[in-house]
Design a protein with these regions (language model features):
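Short acidic/polar inter-strand loop motif in beta-rich domains
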Residues: 126-133, 258-265
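Short edge beta-strand/loop segments characteristic of extracellular beta-sandwich folds
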Residues: 63-71, 184-190
Length: 273
């Protein structure tokens, strides 16, 4: 069975593999998007690879990719990744917690950035306390900043919210999943983000209460695999990609929460062979 279940009617999205998803986000490949990491490890090891465009016209939906090679075993695994832009009025772009069940640290999502030149920084920490960081510069064209948002865009009220849909690209390519294999999981959700911020006299002012997704929990069977802490810097209608290493057949489930206490969830079975 290759269809996911949710509490609303599902719509097809992104008919293609991982490369097609990157193209949709404006990045043809992780290699093109990410030069050698500019950061250096604080305690040894290799820093994360950070992929994002050098220049973008649309700061409301900037693709960000984070990948890191690190053991993912119970006694030694990459535990968390933070994405930050200290120059922005919403500095934190998210905090992402992983477990050995992820198999590999890979994360792709879309964030809001202010216009002008700035630097996006990724900090990573493993279960033994080692830390790494990588920083890359980006320029958002003048007038293209995505941090303002005091009011909902016309036609984008709460009625435009839809629960998530889970997609497993490997199954769509007709390739079976094997026990212990690391696979991509893509989650698409229709949900607007309102930062509540406006710029007046060159200063950012909070005008209204923000409305946004605050978190995402990923479960496989009864165990929580990942916990993502989200912020108003997340783009509208996000597409989030992460990895999973299923050792047994089971059900992958995602649960989003927003700033008004609502939960939106979906599930998808994983079968081998």
């Amino acid at each position: 069975m290759t269809t996911s279940s949710s509490r609303v009617r599902r719509r097809a999205f992104l008919r293609g593999g991982g490369a097609a998803g990157l193209a949709l986000l404006g990045i043809r490949s992780i290699g093109e998007a990410a030069a050698p990491p500019s950061g250096t490890p604080d305690d040894g090891g290799e820093p994360p690879v950070l992929g994002l465009p050098r220049l973008t016209e649309n700061g409301a939906k900037v693709p960000i990719i984070v990948e890191m090679t690190h053991p993912m075993e119970p006694d030694h695994h990459l535990a968390s990744v933070r994405v930050v832009n200290d120059r922005d009025p919403i500095p934190s772009k998210g905090e992402f917690h992983f477990s050995p069940a992820n198999g590999h640290v890979y994360l792709a999502f879309q964030a809001r950035l202010d216009d002008g030149r700035s630097a996006v920084r990724v900090g990573a920490e493993c279960s033994r306390g080692q830390r790494w960081s990588t920083t890359r510069e980006i320029r958002v064209a003048a007038g293209g900043g995505g941090c303002a948002g005091p009011l909902p865009v016309s036609g984008r009220g709460e009625g435009e919210i839809r629960p998530p849909v889970i997609r497993l690209p490997q199954l769509l390519r007709g390739q079976p999943i094997e026990p212990g294999q690391i696979i991509d999981v893509q989650v698409k959700l229709k949900h607007p983000t309102r930062t509540g911020l406006v710029r007046r006299g060159g200063q950012w002012v909070s005008e209204t209460e923000p409305f946004y997704l605050t978190g995402l929990d990923v479960f496989y069977g009864s165990a929580r695999v990942s916990r993502f802490v989200l912020t108003p810097a997340l783009a509208d209608d996000p597409l989030i990609t992460f990895r999973l290493r299923p050792r047994d057949e089971g059900l992958v489930r995602v649960v989003f929460r927003n700033s008004r206490g609502a939960e939106l969830d979906a599930s998808h079975p994983i079968r081998f062979g």
